Amino acid sequence: MVENQSYYEWLKNQPAQYQDEVLGKTRAKLFRDGGMTVERFRALQLDKHFTPLTLEQMRALEPKAFDKAFAAVVKLDNTKDRVLAVKRTDWGDLPNVMIAHAKDTITTHKHYQKAKSGELSSALFLVDEYLTDDFVLKLHHTIKGYDNVRIVPVHAEEQLGRNKIPMAYALALSEMLGVDMDLGIVQAKRAYRTSSDGVGRLLKRVSFDGVVLSGHHYMIVDDVITQGGTLADLRGFIESKGGKVILASTLNGKPNSAKLPITKATLGQLRKQAGKEIEQWWQEQFGYDFSQFTESEARYLAKQIHRYGIDAIRDILFASRP
């Protein structure tokens, strides 16, 4: 690299194949065609090794630009030792989760494990593989009527390392939709849901922290949806702080997981099977009742009660509370 030459300028002079490998094909095309400005490139918040900078590093490198870009959305605060309540809000008119690839799993893809364990370049390759123009167009039509839209990825630390797929997915959507990505909302408590069974997923709530811009519209994204608990927890945090979640999207998931709001029929069936004791216990433990379960969470719990009996499930829940 030439002395005093920026990484942006240096990368501009590299072969297209190298740019594709570093940025991914979609971003590299924007980069070459002039669609990715220096400001947008910096907004990726990556160093020359394509590793996310810490907030402290970003502030040290360009304090004025950092304060201008993040003063409203980033709170430099240590949440590690604080216990943050998990909130959920009424479902309202939230549409189904939009899933980019629902035909089969992405876990067998050659880049999946590296992306899941913290390699952003692998995550970007993975996103490029499954994100289509037609799907992005559907997202565009869904959000085009809203102003002040921000994309928030789930920051999830799994046991293999820090999962980069949600961030890569958010980066791609941010550029293709022309919507700002917001990294100021962070997961404050690890859940390790990837290796959890259904009951474990129900009990391991995810808390978030950060600054929500009241009155703004949010699109929340994750890599995969199973029961939808993480998205529900993130939505609850944002809406309890004055934001409005207009859409949730994941790169992968089964079609039957796409419906987040619990239906009246499923809620009625769950309450009939579980009785008042378990719902009251849940309300005391987590601060919300069965009406704020996702459809998949409720169906799973009802299925387990039917299979093993209410007494067995009550014992499992009460004994398994983290």
Residue ranges and their predicted role:
Residues 74-148, 192-212, 287, 301:
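Active-site-facing substrate-recognition patch
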Residues 23, 28-61:
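Acidic, low-complexity, intrinsically disordered interaction modules
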Residues 217-241, 247-248:
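A contiguous pocket-lining binding segment that forms or flanks enzyme active sites
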Residues 74-104, 235-322:
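PRPP-dependent phosphoribosyltransferase catalytic core
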